[in-house]
UniProtKB/Swiss-Prot annotation:
Gene: MLO6
UniProtKB keywords: Calmodulin-binding, Membrane, Pathogenesis-related protein, Plant defense, Transmembrane, Transmembrane helix
Protein known as: MLO-like protein 6
Pfam families: Mlo
Residues in the Extracellular compartment per record: 1-15, 83-161, 306-314, 390-411
Record's function text: May be involved in modulation of pathogen defense and leaf cell death. Activity seems to be regulated by Ca(2+)-dependent calmodulin binding and seems not to require heterotrimeric G proteins.
Segments of this protein annotated with the region Calmodulin-binding: 447-468
Region spans: Disordered: 461-583
Protein's organism: Arabidopsis thaliana
Keyword Manganese: no
Disulfide feature: none
Residues in compartment: Cytoplasmic: 37-61, 183-284, 336-368, 433-583
Transmembrane annotation, as ranges: 16-36, 62-82, 162-182, 285-305, 315-335, 369-389, 412-432
Length: 583
């Protein structure tokens, strides 16, 4: 160690070299910061609040990487000075003793009784024998003077620093690619959604038509002999996920069941189910892109699996593969069980088969648990990719972490297979089936309506806290007192009560609920400017109006033909005399 050449300090380094390094680092950092800012501005412009929040989580993750980098830089000197006995340091190595001896310059393998005493001394020669890296700190090994080994060397800390950064970057990129590919497959749903607004769809889905449940398109797909046995049900659903995992009949049937369970009668032709799914998926993407403490703990456990002799390449890559197959099968089973529940209520159905959503179809009664499993799969697969990239960069293609070609082939092939399954099979299936829970998600409202609701809710809670009455505070307090057909949820109300004794808050709560509101088309902001100029005049004339205006559902207009064709639900007419936001 006496012949070891110490590295230069900044006192011995040219100032122009230091300036060039600082300039390059600052330039790269500024470009990345501006790029992230531009992406965030584009998300705001396109009203992609969920994706903007996901971007904020990515920025928080990068900030966490900065803190880890700072701690590693500051603490590597202190950690490398922690000395442990050689017999403890000789356990759980990625390389075998013979491979370490060959790789680090020892021609013959030491005897078994001398192996523990000599093995760690070989590692002390790494920096002088391998020219591809320089030591991260200057000086010498203080632990060698004591006959011990450093807990983690300074150069080992530097390599760990690089791995954590690669892991975070690979995870974010992997999630973005998976989300983009999944949305690409879901584009075909737009055509199915538009079909529900056509006259042909109303003819083919006559609500007065009686059929056997097995004779419907949904019944022929799910109600068969194999669905009677749990074993055959899981076997068929396992293979079904690989071939047309989401079909048109499944989409339309689950869409109809969601609308009937959560929305107002007659909303079938107006509600855009595909946009609701898209908003929900964007909301879930915020969770997927984040690396929470549980996921970080799993990453630490994965690092322990690289010990020589565990052969982690034979089982670790298959964990995400098996989990994603089980999740895909479970989602298919849920769709089939929804169909079986229809048959349990009777062999004959009227109109479109009506599925009834419920949390009991999901594991532990929690639809969000499936999202956690998908998150775990994405991270595990990203971990495999990041570790392969990092180990190849640091030690070459053939190293102690993947010694054989079989290891490399398994890691790459399984990783690509999981990527395809998660993007094109499981993610679209998850986005559709998880809407079959007992509760609908807040994303059922568009961005502006959700903002108005939150603002009103905050104001109402504030008034209650101060003991005020909420009579003067409603979501319409800055809106027209009598909203028009296009800006109010009135036209979705059915069988409105004829009593005027209802309070302002009660009438609003019932009319503004998702079941009784035009949540997807009502835009309070678009009506605000008009309301400012006409609000006072309209209030003075409101009590003197004698004519009645009738509001009817106009979303589906069928042409006259031989015989009257009824839509799925009838909307009763409502008079302004019978409904009012005032007492």
């Amino acid at each position: 160690m006496a012949d070891q050449v110490k590295e230069k300090t900044l006192e011995e380094t040219s100032t122009w070299a230091v300036a060039v390094v600082c300039f390059v680092l600052l330039l790269i950092s500024i470009v990345i910061e501006k790029l992230i800012h531009k992406i965030g501005s584009w998300f705001k412009k396109k009203n992609k609040k969920a994706l903007y929040e996901a971007l904020e989580k990515v920025k928080a993750e990068l900030m966490l990487m900065g803190f880890i980098s700072l701690l590693l830089t500051i603490g590597q000197g202190y950690i490398s000075n922690i000395c442990i006995p050689k017999n403890i340091a000789a356990s759980m190595h990625p390389c075998s003793a013979s491979e370490e001896a060959r790789k680090y310059g020892k021609k013959d393998v030491p005897k078994e009784d001398e192996e523990e005493n000599l093995r760690r001394k070989l590692l002390q020669l790494v920096d002088s024998l391998i020219p591809r890296r320089s030591l991260a700190t200057k000086g010498y090994d203080k632990c060698a003077e004591k006959g011990k080994v450093a807990f983690v060397s300074a150069y080992g800390m530097h390599q760990l620093h690089i791995f954590i950064f690669v892991l975070a970057v690979c995870h974010v990129i992997y999630c973005i690619v998976t989300y983009a590919l999944g949305k690409t497959k879901m584009r075909r749903w737009k055509k199915w959604e538009e079909e529900t607004k056509t006259i042909e769809y109303q003819y083919s889905h006559d609500p007065e038509r009686f059929r056997f449940a097995r004779d419907t398109s949904f019944g022929r797909r799910h109600l068969s002999f194999w669905s009677k046995s749990t074993i055959t049900l899981w076997i068929v659903c396992f293979f079904r996920q690989f071939f047309r995992s989401v079909t048109k009949v499944d989409y339309l049937t689950l869409r109809h069941g969601f609308i009937m369970a959560h929305l107002a009668p007659g909303s079938d032709a107006r509600f855009d189910f595909r946009k609701y799914i898209q908003r929900s998926l964007e909301e879930d993407f915020k969770t997927i892109v984040e690396i929470n403490p549980v996921i970080w703990f799993i990453a630490v456990l994965f690092l322990l699996t690289n010990t020589n002799g565990l052969n982690s390449y034979l089982w670790l890559p298959f964990i995400p593969f098996i989990v994603i197959l089980i999740v895909g099968t479970k989602l298919q089973v849920i769709i089939t069980k929804l169909g079986l529940r229809i048959q349990e209520k009777g062999d004959v159905v009227k109109g479109t088969p009506l599925v009834q959503p419920g949390d009991h179809f999901f594991w532990f009664g929690r639809p969000r648990f499936i999202l956690f499993l998908i998150h775990l799969v994405l991270f595990t697969n990203a971990f495999q990719l990041a570790f392969f990239v990092w180990s190849t960069y640091e030690f070459g293609l053939k190293n102690c972490f993947h010694e054989s070609r079989v290891d490399v082939i398994i890691r790459i092939s399984i990783g690509l297979l999981v990527q395809i399954l998660c993007s094109y099979v499981t993610l679209p299936l998850y986005a559709l089936v998880t809407q079959m829970g007992s509760k609908m998600k807040p994303t059922v409202f568009n961005e502006r309506v959700a903002t108005a609701l939150k603002s009103w809710h905050h104001t109402a809670k504030k008034n209650i806290k101060h003991g005020r009455t909420s009579e003067s505070t409603t979501p319409f307090s800055s809106r027209p007192t009598t909203p028009t057909h296009g800006s109010s949820p009135i036209h979705l109300l059915r069988n409105a009560p004829h009593k005027r004794s209802r309070s302002v808050d009660e009438s609003f709560a019932n009319s503004f609920s998702p079941r009784n509101s035009d949540f997807d088309s009502w835009d309070p902001e678009s009506q605000h400017e008009t309301a400012e100029t006409s609000n006072s005049n309209h209030r003075s004339r409101f009590g003197e109006e004698e004519s009645e205006k009738k509001f009817v559902s106009s979303s589906v207009e069928l042409p006259p033909g031989p015989g009257q064709i009824r839509t799925q639900h009838e909307i009763s007419t409502i008079s302004l005399r019978d409904f009012s936001f005032k007492r």
